[in-house]
């Protein structure tokens, strides 16, 4: 079971991501592109180019979780920014 602290930080990768990436690939994007360190109290959110799939990577103190969502219709709203990340 996942539980989140009241001071949860959410980092959104603004560039589209290859949804075939798993734990290691997403961890690499976080450390190399977003220049962040996956840590407790933070969620890292990724989407594909069509904005129909979502992956969230989080650390619970004992290991990494990858959560996925695929929309059957419609798309996710996504922020735009030149620096490649957003902190919500």
Predicted segment positions?
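Polybasic/polar functional segments that serve as interface/processing modules
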Residues: 1-85
């Amino acid at each position: 079971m996942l539980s989140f602290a009241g001071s949860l930080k959410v980092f959104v990768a603004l560039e589209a991501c290859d949804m075939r990436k798993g734990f290691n690939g997403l961890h690499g994007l976080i450390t190399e592109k977003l220049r962040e360190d996956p840590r407790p109290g933070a969620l890292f959110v990724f989407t594909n180019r069509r904005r129909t799939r979502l992956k969230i990577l989080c650390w619970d103190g004992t290991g990494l979780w990858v959560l996925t969502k695929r929309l059957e219709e419609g798309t996710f709203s996504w922020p735009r920014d030149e620096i490649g990340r957003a902190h919500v």
